[in-house]
């Protein structure tokens, strides 16, 4: 495998072509953003930690029957992945009220929800990734109902697997977002699963071990990511 020119740069990763049209190299950066890019900073070694955390969690999910774009970890900052066409939607899964959901619905943060909540947002930076419903997504040509049903099924499998796994590590999986890509007629879990994309709270203390520490200027951001890496790597 030969790494070639950069295909795309996002907020947290760079994507490079390879000599194989079906694969890309994903490079994890230390850049941190919040509030749709309005707040910017860096977290030392975040890319290294998120690369490792994502690799381990994707391997776990593959073993549990969730197909992903992940092929292998190349080095401390890079992964080899299948080159997918990202569906321009994020699927958000919520087990406990927090963040925007708590604010919009007037719920106390930390309230356990009576059922898991699934939401979708339209991946569009200019519009600040608005929440939409299934009918919006189909009406504007982002997907179809059959594909959406499969996306929700993938999200549910990811939630069931990760909730159980993190529970064993003494962590509550509060909520998370995933991206899904199309590849040779299949849907694959793509992007990353890390403290950047999940809310993770210590079960005993309630301590936040995720990007909320950066969003809310709580300090000890690197230490929180390191703690997640340590527990995932047990």
UniProtKB/Swiss-Prot annotation:
The protein's matches in SUPFAM superfamilies, at most eight in alphabetical order, are given as: SAICAR synthase-like (SSF56104)
The gene name on file is: purC
Entry GO MF terms? ATP binding; phosphoribosylaminoimidazolesuccinocarboxamide synthase activity
Family indicated by similarity: Belongs to the SAICAR synthetase family.
User: InterPro entries this protein is in?
Assistant: SAICAR_synt/ADE2_N, SAICAR_synt_PurC, SAICAR_synth, SAICAR_synthetase, SAICAR_synthetase_CS
What is the E.C. number?
Answer: 6.3.2.6
Matching HAMAP family: SAICAR_synth (MF_00137)
Keyword presence, Oxidoreductase:
no
Q: Which UniProt keywords apply?
A: ATP-binding, Ligase, Nucleotide-binding, Purine biosynthesis
Lineage of the species this protein comes from: Bacteria, Bacillati, Bacillota, Clostridia, Eubacteriales
Listed under catalytic activity are: 5-amino-1-(5-phospho-D-ribosyl)imidazole-4-carboxylate + L-aspartate + ATP = (2S)-2-[5-amino-1-(5-phospho-beta-D-ribosyl)imidazole-4-carboxamido]succinate + ADP + phosphate + 2 H(+)
Which pathway is this protein assigned to? Purine metabolism; IMP biosynthesis via de novo pathway; 5-amino-1-(5-phospho-D-ribosyl)imidazole-4-carboxamide from 5-amino-1-(5-phospho-D-ribosyl)imidazole-4-carboxylate: step 1/2
EC class name: ligase
Biological process terms from the Gene Ontology for this record are: 'de novo' IMP biosynthetic process; cobalamin biosynthetic process
Q: What is the protein's given name?
A: Phosphoribosylaminoimidazole-succinocarboxamide synthase
**The organism of origin for this protein:** Clostridium botulinum (strain Langeland / NCTC 10281 / Type F)
């Amino acid at each position: 495998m030969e790494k070639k020119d950069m295909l795309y740069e996002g907020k947290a990763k760079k994507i490079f072509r390879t000599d194989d049209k079906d694969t890309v190299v994903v490079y994890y950066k230390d850049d941190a953003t919040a509030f749709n890019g309005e707040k910017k900073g860096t977290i030392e070694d975040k890319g290294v930690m998120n690369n490792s955390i994502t690799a381990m969690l994707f391997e776990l999910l593959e073993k549990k029957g969730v197909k992903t774009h992940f092929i292998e970890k190349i080095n401390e900052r890079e992964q080899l992945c299948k080159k997918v066409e990202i569906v321009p939607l994020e699927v958000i899964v919520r087990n406990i009220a927090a963040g925007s959901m708590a604010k919009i619905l007037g719920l106390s943060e930390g309230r356990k929800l009576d059922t898991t909540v699934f939401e979708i947002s339209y991946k569009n930076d200019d519009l600040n990734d608005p929440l939409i419903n299934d009918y919006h997504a189909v009406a504007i040509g982002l997907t179809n109902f059959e594909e959406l049903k499969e996306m929700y099924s993938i999200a549910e499998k990811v939630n069931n697997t990760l909730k159980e796994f993190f529970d064993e590590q003494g962590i509550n999986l509060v909520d998370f977002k995933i991206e899904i890509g199309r590849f040779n007629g299949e849907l694959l879990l793509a992007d990353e699963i890390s403290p950047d994309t999940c809310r993770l709270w210590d079960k005993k203390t309630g301590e936040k071990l995720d990007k909320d520490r950066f969003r809310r200027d709580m300090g000890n951001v690197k230490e929180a990511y390191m703690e997640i890496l340590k527990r995932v790597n047990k």
